[in-house]
Amino acid sequence: MDKKNGLTYAEAGVDIDAGNALVETIKPFVRATRRAGADAELGGFGGLFDLKAAGFQDPILVAANDGVGSKVKLAIETGQHDTIGVDLVAMCVNDLIVQGAEPLFFLDYYATGKLEPATAASVVKGIADGCREAGCALIGGETAEMPGLYTGKDYDLAGFAVGAVERGHLLPRTDIAAGDLLLGLPSSGLHSNGFSLVRRVLADNGASLDGPAPYEPGKTLGESLLTPTRIYVRPLLHVFAATQAVKALAHITGGGFQENLPRVLPAGFGLALDLSALAVPPVFGWLAREGGIAETEMLRTFNCGIGMVLIVANDEASKVEEALRAAGEQPIRLGSVIPAPETGPRVTFQGQLSL
């Protein structure tokens, strides 16, 4: 410490210059997320968005925030930081689209004990990539350097997304009825849930993140587990434009089918799912075998191969499937809406997972 000039903020562990340099580095990434309604420029005290410029007439705003859980620990341990930002965006915007809302803008929070500009820039680039895929603007964020609160290279993330839907088009609808069909959209793998259990399986088996993934040739275990969460926004917006047949959507995250599907059901209804219809990605079978995890625990922890579920009228299911395929999706018929059982869970399973 320079006693003549006194103690500085940098000597206390916070480097303002590094933070400013980071902002300059990420500005091109942020600008690339521009869209109607937002110029995606950094530097102001707050981000701006013009709903009229985005084409909305009588919108309802929908907001969501989320994180990526302990998946971020795998990014830190492998040094692969370029896709964890995509996960962050996906977890937020998928929660908007299930209510019928088009994602409009996004803000992020990055917290660490010591700012590593290259790491932070890689994370923000991933966030910008996710925003571009979702069609929303990255209009601001916060980088917090907090020495003593985080150790080593640890960091954490939070995301905040806002979307809009025209009044009268909110989901879920109130006309869900027995006989409606469930259509599932495939996940890319684990997405961003269950990683505390994943890390326990890795630790118990002495598995190396740098070693080959036993179930996915050509990738390391770390690369495979860090496969980013799918963003379902564009295909679902395409479906909304093509047909008015979607009654409800559910983002399958922590808690699986039995926790997330009832959130969109009216009272008096349940769901019957055929587990044998699922094309379960190999990572889930590997985890179940290596960890000795029962099917019931897999179902309540992971998405098991389905990241999004649509509820549609039986007689309009083919139209929705056609629109989904035109958008590049491969929908799977999972089951149907049934009258709620008098006792027991509202989601019942038939068949078995192919783990």
Curated annotation (Swiss-Prot):
**Gene Ontology cellular component annotations, sorted alphabetically:** cytosol
A single GO molecular function, which one? phosphoribosylamine-glycine ligase activity
Q: Which UniProt keywords apply?
A: ATP-binding, Cytoplasm, Ligase, Nucleotide-binding, Purine biosynthesis
Q: EC number(s) per UniProt?
A: 6.3.3.1
Pathway stated in the Swiss-Prot or TrEMBL entry: Purine metabolism; IMP biosynthesis via de novo pathway; 5-amino-1-(5-phospho-D-ribosyl)imidazole from N(2)-formyl-N(1)-(5-phospho-D-ribosyl)glycinamide: step 2/2
Q: Which Gene3D superfamilies match?
A: PurM-like C-terminal domain, PurM-like, N-terminal domain
Q: Which InterPro entries does the record cross-reference, listed alphabetically?
A: PurM-like_C_dom, PurM-like_C_sf, PurM-like_N, PurM-like_N_sf, PurM_cligase
* Family annotation (Pfam families): AIRS, AIRS_C
Spans through the membrane: none
Kindly list the places in or outside the cell where this protein is found, as annotated in its UniProt entry. Answer: Cytoplasm
The keyword Zinc belongs to this UniProt entry's keyword annotation: no
Q: Which reaction does it catalyse?
A: 2-formamido-N(1)-(5-O-phospho-beta-D-ribosyl)acetamidine + ATP = 5-amino-1-(5-phospho-beta-D-ribosyl)imidazole + ADP + phosphate + H(+)
Q: Which CDD domains match?
A: PurM
Gene Ontology BP term (one): adenine biosynthetic process
For this chain, the family text in UniProt reads:
Belongs to the AIR synthase family.
Q: Could you tell me what this protein is called?
A: Phosphoribosylformylglycinamidine cyclo-ligase
Query: Which species does the entry assign this protein to?
Result: Beijerinckia indica subsp. indica (strain ATCC 9039 / DSM 1715 / NCIMB 8712)
Name the gene behind this protein. purM
